């Protein structure tokens, strides 16, 4: 399994700190695999990522038609499909999400596990490298209907240039609109996706909306969807304080074992 890796996308300076925390969390759980940071040209300074021990891979945004760009740029997408459950930070650019597809071009690897740069690994997940393509956890954060949809914050992939080219053929077609960008597209491209337990991609709003499912002693990955833990101010800072404090402890390299035990008993 040496030709395996975790991979994330860092497409703006604001996600550099997220990817650093993600790498720290993988190191803390004694992962055997590297973290590859896909970085589009001129999108951020990769030096802090390299200093954290990440491997850098330059990737490029797919070439989109003008019509596709107009439909999916931030203002247009938010008018047509507003985020009414939480707030996306100002640095979020929906078009950048499609850079995630470039991981299928990393054919020097046999298997990749993608993690969004706003995720944190609490327990070792190296075993996911043995899982087939395409595995993902449900988009579970508000009600049980989320079990019917996947969330693209974590998934397994088998790199293939042929797969990437098929994706490009289906991605930018006349009139197509991917409501949640890469997430909606990937569910369409992999309609028979394999469902992982939600504990492999526990969305932070699950902590607020379905607390009976938030079991600290079993969660493997936290996904800080919507507001980010490194944002200085947002409307849910107090409600999400235990999750935010945990993220900062990992980012700053503090021991979180005791904190996790205390949270599990709470």
Please report, for each region that a protein language model flagged, where it lies by residue.
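GT-A fold catalytic core of metal-dependent nucleotide-sugar glycosyltransferases
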Residues: 58, 62, 92-149, 156-161
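Active-site-proximal specificity loops/subdomain of glycosyltransferases
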Residues: 47-107
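Short loop/helix-cap segments at secondary-structure boundaries that form the rim of catalytic
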Residues: 45-51, 126-131, 232-234
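Short, flexible loop segments at the rims of nucleotide/cofactor-binding pockets, characterized by
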Residues: 12-13, 88-93, 113-115, 173-175
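A glycosyltransferase accessory/donor-loop signature
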Residues: 1-22, 30-31, 37-40, 50-52, ...
